[in-house]
């Protein structure tokens, strides 16, 4: 049986963490509906991986750079990126982060200290190593 040790986390902190886990799951579920309806062209679902993205992001300071991958929606929501602009990004709108050039997670945002991802997943590690050493 798995044991949970809350250590020094208050009820409020645990509730906030749960909300941060729930938001990307709700968005993921909606995006899969939109994909099936043909309203978006692609979606790389991260359902079941929310705790990885949210936990890693919450363990970092807001001014530390993070290098997410395409299934790490929780990074973007935990860094409080505006949902309206995220949805414009995924729809390829001019108002999205990449100004309509693509509809995925390949964008970064310096304001939120998020590095844009590379399609080939392995090379992202070298970038993270360089940032950590800088």
Tell me the role of every PLM-derived stretch.
Residues 1-41, 62:
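Cofactor-/ligand-binding subdomain signature composed of acidic, glycine-rich
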Residues 29-134:
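Cofactor-binding active-site loop characterized by glycine-rich and histidine/acidic residues
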